[in-house]
Amino acid sequence: MIDQIIDYNRSFVERKGYEKYLTDKYPDKKLAVLSCMDTRLTELLPAALGLKNGDAKIIKNAGGLVISAFDSAMRSLIVAIYELGVKEIMVVAHSHCGACHMSYDHFHHEMIARGVTDETLDTIRKCGIDLHHWLEGFKDTPTSVRKTVETIKTHPLVPKDIVVRGFIIDSETGALEEIC
């Protein structure tokens, strides 16, 4: 698959397909969106929000969550605020999210089946990494949105004037429901 993508990319560049996407690094709407990496949202999310290339910083991860105050999603939001001029943040989870059903037991079984040893997992635990917490999903989407919004709003590095709001998008219709 990657080779096909590389071939397509050569053609894209040769025909100057990039020209309609040219913009700078600063989001025109001074907006950051934290959302899930679900494939159903790849085109639906920006279309449903009326966003085009250059409008917003879109940060995606499994579940659209901030799981700790200093994880990579939070780092990206801090960079967006201080380096890129973001003034508003939307946390956008979605209906029927697979992260809702993630379980450490499933991941553990799959990792062992694919060659990760118990010794490796023990080493990770001894380094202070809680794989149960890191790989466990959430049980309730609205609660996870509220928790992520609260983590962002109360972060010691997030200025008080930054607007942070939480939503759930219907992964079929694109309809937004404001949670907080």
Q: Language-model features: where?
A:
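Ordered, amphipathic secondary-structure segments that act as subunit-interaction surfaces
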Residues: 82-94
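Gly/Ser/Thr-rich loops at beta-strand to alpha-helix junctions
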Residues: 38-40, 95-99
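Structural motif
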Residues: 30-33, 56-57, 87-90, 165-166
